[in-house]
Amino acid sequence: MTFRIAVVQPICHPPGSDAANIADAERAIARAAGEGAEFVCFPETYPGPWRMPATFDPTAAMVEAAVKHRTHVVFGTIAPIDAKAATAHNLICMAYPDGRAPARYRRTHPNGPWIYTGGPAWEFQWVPGDEFPVFDTVHGKVGLAMCSEVYMPEVARALALRGAELIFMPAGKDKRKLWATWRTLIWARAIENLAIVVTTQNLFDHSERGLAMVASPEDILFESTIAGTAVVDVNLERVRYLRATRDQVGSSEACAAKQGVLGPQWQRPELYERIYPRPQREAAE
């Protein structure tokens, strides 16, 4: 069954005026739903807030918009832990069209807290999460991740092994010299996990180079570097076929991705602990 995903790459109100992003997001949801979108994907930390102490929480507004327009809304915010210590989890959430409590993923990588302090946009002491939840929807199983976790293949693989067929991995802001490798890795995560992977990012002005993208295991379905919203048709039947079937001699004549790489034909989990022993890690300084 084909369904539609709206990928929103907004001009973002910066820290200090970021509460204004909520109204912009509500308008984008209404427009996307009017074009038949059953998922609307915003960037990391959009609508916000970007900093601690948090001055607003967009969750109720995003849930209300999802219910009003009968769509799923993937959005970014933070979950304050301690206002005095300025600690928070960084979240990617998904609001449901039936109004249930939103799905939430707490960013897990890298080791915190250094990544969200000292720059011009974010300012909080990030506390990593430690779970890789996967969420059921009427269209398929959804995994959530974010931003430079694309450089950690373990994140998307964990979601895929838990059944995620559609992985939203929205990002924060201008990637500068990382742009080309980032783009490559979004598609790589789709190829190696036999999944649809979706990303987008915030733009603070029209001079910045964006990266909005929908990748399947066999093709890039959509990509854009400019501000705006695109509605993309997606079908998970091919993903399910590639996962359910076995690779064999000559299969490359019909398949542009390797079949069955998540299953026992390819996987050898008994080797992986020897390859990569996992000592207890300290947080990075």
Where does each model-flagged region fall?
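Active-site-proximal beta-strand elements of phosphoester/diester hydrolases
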Residues: 2-14, 104, 140-149, 168
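Short beta-strand scaffold segments in enzyme catalytic cores
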Residues: 75-77, 90-94, 133-135, 210-214, ...
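C-terminal beta-strand edge segments of enzyme domains
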Residues: 202-285
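Active-site catalytic loop in hydrolytic enzyme cores
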Residues: 83-162, 175-184
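Acidic/histidine-rich helix-loop elements
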Residues: 11-20, 117-120
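Cys-nucleophile CN-hydrolase/nitrilase-fold catalytic domain and related Cys-dependent amidase chemistry
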Residues: 15-106, 175-191
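CN hydrolase (nitrilase-like) catalytic-core segments centered on the catalytic cysteine
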Residues: 55-75, 141, 147-230
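Active-site beta-loop-alpha junctions enriched in small/polar residues
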Residues: 10-13, 78-80, 106-110, 147, ...
